[in-house]
Amino acid sequence: MLFFQQSDFLDRDNLPDFLNRRGLKGYGVEVGTHRGDYAKVILEKWEGRRLDCIDPWENSDAYKDQAVSLWGGARNREEDYDAAFKNLNGFGERVRLIRDYSPQAANKYQNNSLDFVYIDGDHKQVAVACDLWAWYPKLKTGGILAGHDIVCPGELPDKNWGKEIQPAVLEFCKMFNTTCYLIVESLCLPWSYYFIRS
């Protein structure tokens, strides 16, 4: 089986329109909301009822390691939470900010209850694998499990997250015998991906 195929749309900013076309307009989750920038894009375009934004917004050792890789140093996570609140406050009851770690948060949702989940949290391989396994059962049949930063190892040497995320996604594809659709974005690279729950 061919595990990776190119998506029929470009750029993750078009994911909300894709969800709308598929009639996925109920409940969604974003894991790793950070400052709320992508959650805002989702909420502006997606016709769904509510998006839960999950992020611990705390300075863990794992976060500090990623922060050095992404921004050259650690950031104040409380400032990130405040920015997310400011970015998303105008959406009212369509959004909830939930301070929690992803696998623990997933346990609070019923199986077969969500239309989509977008994963952009901890980029370490084991964490990505845990997120995929934790959230996949929460999707309705036909729901979308998507994520960010699957850039192929070596394509952007100064950004090391692809070497962690891609193996976790490939293993997940093999275990579920499913196709991963790659969403081409900037630099003609597949930054985002998604699965359709069968």
Predicted features along the sequence, with ranges:
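S-adenosylmethionine/decaboxylated-SAM
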Residues: 2, 6-8, 12-198
